[in-house]
Amino acid sequence: MAISKGAINVRSIFIGGEEPCICAPVVGVDAEQVLAETRQISAKKPHLIEWRADFFNGIHDDRQVVATAKEIRTIAGDIPILFTVRSEREGGRPIPLTEEEKMRLFETVCQSGAIDLLDYELVHEPYVATVRQLSRQYGVRLILSYHNFDFTPAKEELVAKMRQAGKYGADIAKVAVMPKSLQDVLVLLQATEEARQELPIPLITMSMGGLGAITRLAGGLFGSAVTFAVGQQSSAPGQIPIEEVKDVLSVIMKYSQ
């Protein structure tokens, strides 16, 4: 059974197809670290690599970002690259860019041909249409995301966030929340299943931290098309090493058909 109603093809992979994809983050602070991490992660063959550019100390320099993105592209080969500049309010590093400056950076990076997917946060609603337009212009898939590192909102609110992402033209909707109890974990999974039944786009969902670890392993059964795993360094609480995620997913998918 397909994870999503509407799987999308990105290079050599299908997101939302028969099996969940594994995405490994790159969080180096300079080009040397970023490229070293990319080499190490690429050797582990994840389905996707996410460059968390908010960790990059050259984020203010478009030319440096593009040059590094192109080198990541070369090293990664046919592995799709997700470009993310996470805001501080949603768990990222502080960066010296306004939203207007981010728009310029996104257009430059998308135009370079070095990336395949772009993550942007729903909270920046006035800029979502601009990001949607430029991502389409350059053939880059758009993930519209919502992160809450404080608590897990009600199921209805989580479904509404994913619905909002779809309404704004996202290719993929993403929700990541922090649980305070196992009940919160169940809320996230229930929201994922409900949104999967309703929306025609792939979903990425997770409950963070140790309590939510099960969602990173079994989330695909409920409709989460991508799980984030540690390739070299973690970018969020509760991420599990890629080798262990691969082992567990292979067992789950084998016996859940």
UniProtKB/Swiss-Prot annotation:
Record field: catalytic activity: 3-dehydroquinate = 3-dehydroshikimate + H2O
Active-site residues, record numbering mapped to chain: H147, K174
Domain of life: Bacteria
Protein name as catalogued: 3-dehydroquinate dehydratase
One GO term (biological process): amino acid biosynthetic process
Binding site for 3-dehydroquinate: E50, W51, R52, R86, R216, S235, Q239
Metabolic or biological pathway: Metabolic intermediate biosynthesis; chorismate biosynthesis; chorismate from D-erythrose 4-phosphate and phosphoenolpyruvate: step 3/7
Record PANTHER family: 3-DEHYDROQUINATE DEHYDRATASE
Enzyme class at the top of the EC tree: lyase
Subunit structure: Homodimer.
Family to which this protein belongs: Belongs to the type-I 3-dehydroquinase family.
Gene: aroD
Organism this protein belongs to: Geobacillus thermodenitrificans (strain NG80-2)
Stored InterPro entries: Aldolase_TIM, DHquinase_I, Type-I_3-dehydroquinase
Alphabetical list of CDD domains matching this protein: DHQase_I (cd00502)
GO molecular function: 3-dehydroquinate dehydratase activity
Keyword entries, A-Z: Amino-acid biosynthesis, Aromatic amino acid biosynthesis, Lyase, Schiff base
Function per UniProt: Involved in the third step of the chorismate pathway, which leads to the biosynthesis of aromatic amino acids. Catalyzes the cis-dehydration of 3-dehydroquinate (DHQ) and introduces the first double bond of the aromatic ring to yield 3-dehydroshikimate.
Enzyme Commission designation: 4.2.1.10
